[in-house]
Amino acid sequence: MGIRKPALSVGEARRLAAARPEMVQAHLPVATQNSALPQPPENPDQEDRRPAPAVAKRHPSADRQSMLTVDALSSTTAPEKIQVFLSARPPAPQVSKIYDNLILQYSPSKSLQMILRRALGDFEKMLADGSFRTAPKSYPIPQTASEKSIIVQTSRMFPVPLLEVARNHFDPLGLETARAFGHKLATAALASFFAGEKTTKR
């Protein structure tokens, strides 16, 4: 059997061996060559994007509570009031059963003051709803000299709007003095109270 002659000479084999690493390096996948390089972000805007700082959330319920509180306070603000000086005389006997019973325990002045306080409170409501226009303005008073001398004087803070209604009714021309107006107002309040007392009995 004859000896085969190598297909490559020694020199060609050395050149091939030297060129093989370059060929291997040249055929490496692109992904392998670039794996060591830093990858740029897919979106350039993401590079500078940082999470926004947390902002403390306000509780809407607390804000609503404060608004409701402010509204409640403003809605309950008391109207402006002005002091009115009042005077009245005791009723004649049998005009008011309540008064006749009170004078058995208290003086006529004290008894009338107790009733007048209640009567003025009721009369304010009548001024507000307009029912005072059809109410009586006076009541019988005692005719004896000793009883005629009795007069009760007091004062009361009246809401300005209601006071204007009373002035237009009892002093439409604006000519009455303050005390004369106060006497008319107190007398009308007592007259309405005494009339209501009789209606209740029925």
Swiss-Prot record:
Pfam families attached to this UniProt entry: VirC2
Keyword Cell membrane: no
GO biological process, one term: regulation of DNA-templated transcription
Source organism superkingdom: Bacteria
Database matches in InterPro entries: Ribbon_hlx_hlx, VirC2, VirC2_C_sf
Record key words, sorted: Crown gall tumor, Plasmid
Region annotation (Disordered) ranges: 24-65
Name the UniProt record assigns to this protein: Protein virC2
Organism from which the protein derives: Rhizobium rhizogenes
Species lineage: Bacteria, Pseudomonadati, Pseudomonadota, Alphaproteobacteria, Hyphomicrobiales
Annotated gene: virC2
